[in-house]
């Protein structure tokens, strides 16, 4: 039987270990800080110019995307993007086969616009995909009907509709279009958002978790970042976010491969 001081020592050790476990596994889920959602992002600081990202395949630049926010006087906010991608560099990707088979040269372009209410809910969005300089080959439109997001995919010879429940304030974006800021992160925080893939004509739920911290090199300088693990179905990707919420680098599954978006 332990002595009195041994019992005190064991109890103190147990209390310290329990406190560390609660801090690691419980507190991140109970903190009242805002989740990374449209409400938090639309209220964050808006940069005066769009953010430009390089699209990299094994460190080879194959395109770019610009993202930005517009805050309107009536309280609405718009998250917009414009993407240009060289499809020649991606021959063999099933997602682009229908565009490459047309023989149109030049860059593949995609524009998107997500309109957020003053309450931080996505109200509607528009996505257009252009092969080269032609008219849009694919149009995607989404409109919130109460708590149901009604999405339509329209292309030559194709008409497809999809409905799903929209979680209030939750994020939604387009494949290869990164969210440029994720404020109020902490290790252990989890959330979900949806990604629209107009080329595959699908929407996908992405599950995210801040798994730890890591020092990365960005603009030839070391930066302490949060590491966000993102699950796209069976595929896994990562995102590196500065402590102030700025996203520096993000992996994006594209077909069966992974591209990297680098904040310029």
Regions found by a protein language model. Name each.
Residues 1-147, 155-164, 178-264:
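Acidic, serine/threonine-rich low-complexity disordered tracts
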